[in-house]
Design a protein with these regions (language model features):
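Flexible, solvent-exposed coil segments and beta strand-coil junctions
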Residues: 1, 40-52, 91-101, 110, ...
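Well-ordered, non-transmembrane segments within structured domains
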Residues: 1, 5-16, 22-24, 29-30, ...
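Predominantly transmembrane beta-strands of Gram-negative outer membrane beta-barrel pores used
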Residues: 1-72, 80-84
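Short, surface-exposed linear patches
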Residues: 12-15, 27-32, 50-56, 94, ...
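Sequence/structural signature of outer-membrane beta-barrel proteins
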Residues: 13, 37-39, 51, 88-90, ...
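Face-selective signature of the C-terminal outer-membrane beta-barrel domain
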Residues: 70-88, 109-201
């Protein structure tokens, strides 16, 4: 049986859907979310800019999505896949209505991407194994722009322009194998191996 819902709020909306793919064997769950703050602030900025000496521009919004799929091979063997993606965007700047004024613009976009997979297997009544793998990524991009009219002694003037970009990212890859062994009700042994790779740029 499929289930879903949609929620609409003042600043954001979200939706969710879940249900079976193969009856009694696999299922899925997907959810999304998105803000619309920029749709609310845009009319306000338009009204303010009509009476101001500078035209302000800016806003913020984000979205994200989650998805997961489960699959049961047997009563002793299960696997899953999961995924997440999210992004944020921010902007702030102003344009002067005077030709001799100053314009500036600042933009920042950042987000995450995460993917993982796992397999759980009951080897026997005393030994349980779990194998997982995952990938994560974070990215950030900043843009700064500025231009201005600079007067000079000859009164001709010059236009000064500057633009800068800054990018950064972090990525991780993770692999893990773990075992849970219970020889009897009074003893428990856990063992395994883990690999983690970091990349910065």
């Amino acid at each position: 049986e499929y289930h879903g819902n949609i929620s609409i709020g003042l600043l954001a909306a979200r939706a969710n859907l879940e249900g079976p793919i193969i009856k009694d064997r696999s299922s899925f769950n997907v959810s999304v979310r998105r803000t619309w703050m920029e749709l609310i602030t845009w009319p306000l900025m338009t009204a303010v800019n009509k009476k101001a000496d500078t035209e302000w521009k800016g806003g913020y919004h984000f979205y994200d999505m989650n998805a997961k799929v489960d699959y049961s091979f047997t009563d002793r063997s299960r696997a899953y896949l999961s995924f997440y993606m999210g992004s944020d965007s921010y902007r702030n700047g102003e344009d002067s209505k005077d030709i001799h004024g100053e314009d500036r613009d600042f933009r920042w976009r950042w987000g995450n991407l995460i993917g993982s997979a796992g397999w759980n297997y009951l080897i026997n009544r005393k030994l349980f194994a779990t194998f997982t793998g995952g990938y994560t990524r974070y990215r950030s991009h900043i843009i700064q722009k500025q231009n201005a009219f600079v007067s000079s002694p000859d009164k001709n003037g010059q236009v000064y322009f500057q633009e800068g970009h800054y990018r950064s990212a972090m990525e991780d890859v993770n692999l893990r194998a773990s075992f849970d062994y219970r020889p009897n009700v009074d003893h428990r042994i856990r063992m395994g191996s883990d690999y983690l790779f970091h990349l910065f740029r």
